[in-house]
A protein has these predicted regions:
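Residue-level recognition of beta-strand->loop/alpha-helix junctions
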Residues: 2-6, 68, 93-95
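A generic secondary-structure signal
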Residues: 20-24, 52-56, 141, 145
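Active-site segments of SGNH/GDSL-like serine hydrolases
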Residues: 33-42, 51-83, 87
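Aromatic/hydrophobic pocket-lining residues that form the small-molecule binding cavity
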Residues: 46, 50, 135
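Catalytic His-Asp segment of secreted/periplasmic serine-dependent ester chemistry enzymes
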Residues: 71-147
């Protein structure tokens, strides 16, 4: 059973109680994929925060993997790589997708939500995010690591 979680709240509140945020969703899972970082604003607190998050997930799930950020950010990437190495989990770089592919939507493009329903991009903020092709590339990078 896949349980997608949006933990953008954690990215902006790096010292929040992880258990109350994700505990029931990750407990006993075979796999946790940590895919975050772009919304982090406090880069200094991110390094110890991501270490705590990875450690927590490792205690609750059978396997944990983590991706880098879609948007290139060397400081965040170093913190994520450090957490992966410290806790012995796989690190999956994905910033190359943004550099190598035209994978950002434009206003007026049609994308699909998690239920497969189409919607038209109308807001400027969404154009910095990966489009459906970019999301597919991210998913493929994760899946390739899991094989």
């Amino acid at each position: 059973v896949v349980t997608p979680l949006n933990i953008a709240y954690w990215e902006r509140n790096l010292t929040c109680d992880i258990d109350s945020l994700i505990g029931s969703a990750v407990r006993g899972k075979d796999l946790v994929v940590i895919r975050l970082g772009e919304n982090v604003q406090d880069k200094q607190a991110f390094r110890p925060g991501i270490l705590r998050l990875v450690e927590y997930c490792k205690q609750k799930a059978g396997r944990v993997v983590i991706t880098g950020c879609f948007w290139e950010d060397a400081e965040k990437e170093r913190a994520i790589i450090h957490a992966a190495r410290t806790h012995g989990i796989s690190f999956i770089p994905i910033d190359w997708i943004d550099r190598l592919y035209d994978s950002r939507p434009k206003v007026g493009d049609t994308l699909y939500d998690v239920e497969g329903k189409p919607y038209t991009v109308t807001k400027e903020f969404i154009i910095a995010h990966p489009d459906d092709r970019g999301m597919r590339k991210i998913a493929e990078a994760i899946f390739d690591t899991l094989r």
